[in-house]
Amino acid sequence: MGASQKNQELIGGLILFSAALLAIVVNNSPLASYYAMLETINVKLGIENLVIDKNLMHWINDGLMAIYFLYIGLEIKREIIVGTLSKPSNIITPAIAAFAGLAMPSLIYLSINHDIKVINGWAIPSATDIAFTLAILALLGTRVPAKLKLLVITIAIFDDIAAIAIIAIFYTKSLSLLSLSLGTLFILAMIICNRIFKINRSSVYVVLGFFAWFCTIKSGVHATLAGFTTALCIPFRENDKDSPANFMEDSLHPWIIYFILPVFAFANAGISFSGISFSILFEPITLGIIWGLFVGKQLGIFSILAVFKKLKWFKLGESFSNLQLYGISLLCGIGFTMSLFIGVLAFNDTHLLNAIKIGVVVGSVLSGFFGYIVLRFIVTNPS
């Protein structure tokens, strides 16, 4: 990660944090009625009977986040072909750690929440926000070795893959087979353009990907799946920045960190304190998310990394201290963007959404704060 990219990640993280803070301020000020317009102003896209009519909040969550998942897909594809994920020996331990970091928070959430009305939120504390995590790593600078940062990114990538699968399997509320079939045809068209006709024009995949996204929304499957699937169909060539996948990943990166994620944070992080009391912190759904993110994530990930290192199954881990591994395990508990996103998919009740937002913010802040403290002040030999 070069110096300019480190600065981008740091600035992007600060903008993301500022957007979330601004949302809370605006939603608890005289401007709250304008903030509410995110859910009352509708925008239509399409012609005649082929129309998608959604409010601004849905366009942000279904549209902008689909672009974000397109970017994630491009990043994962590059890592699989030429990056860390291209070597099986590099991915086994991070993959198992990521799974443990998904399972443990979910189990903690379910152990606290027994009411059938809130069980659907089990996946909320299982996510990791790579944007915030990279911002803190950039802030730590040389205190975190490059290989340790790579380990965090690899775990986060598997976390993203799991999140995509969870959204597709557990948060699809209705299904139109006709629309899904049409979307699949556009995906197949991209594969044919790539593998058979060797088409390298990015615009072709953008157009076909748009139609796949449109059909996916109409099908009832969440649109983020179309973004991720489209990324896997786009041609990638090693050492060629002009290949469609490289070009699109580089082009999207600043838009993701400076615009899409901050807009998502502003739209979804607006906790309204009107009519709620301090006791909301102690409601089962809030506690389940806080403990899931802050305790479950670090417990699941660190236990795997430490045990595998002890058994000498994790060669890369031998160059790190247990404190370093514990510090990055804490950082993986920053669930912010992805946790909020899953929360919005799981519930639409205003009170529950406020509890979710508070739980996500508190759990993420605790994880980020203590992760920073461990890596910055407690780890004595960062090299």
Swiss-Prot record:
Please tell me whether the keyword Transmembrane helix is annotated for this protein: yes
Q: Which reaction does it catalyse?
A: Na(+)(in) + 2 H(+)(out) = Na(+)(out) + 2 H(+)(in)
Query: Where does it mainly reside?
Result: membrane
Q: GO terms for biological process?
A: regulation of pH
The molecular function terms in GO held by this entry are:
sodium:proton antiporter activity
What name does UniProt use for this protein?
Answer: Na(+)/H(+) antiporter NhaA
Keywords attached to this Swiss-Prot or TrEMBL record, sorted alphabetically, are: Antiport, Cell inner membrane, Cell membrane, Ion transport, Membrane, Sodium, Sodium transport, Transmembrane, Transmembrane helix, Transport
By sequence similarity, the record places it as follows: Belongs to the NhaA Na(+)/H(+) (TC 2.A.33) antiporter family.
What is this protein for, i.e. what is its function? Na(+)/H(+) antiporter that extrudes sodium in exchange for external protons.
Q: Where in the cell is it found?
A: Cell inner membrane
Q: How does it sit in the membrane?
A: Multi-pass membrane protein
Q: Where are the transmembrane segments?
A: 10-30, 56-76, 91-111, 121-141, 150-170, 174-194, 206-226, 254-274, 289-308, 327-347, 355-375
State the superkingdom.
Bacteria
Q: Can you name a GO cellular component term? A: plasma membrane
Establish whether keyword Nucleotide-binding is in the entry. no
Q: Which Gene3D superfamilies does the record cross-reference, listed alphabetically?
A: Na+/H+ antiporter like domain
What HAMAP family has UniProt attached to this entry? NhaA
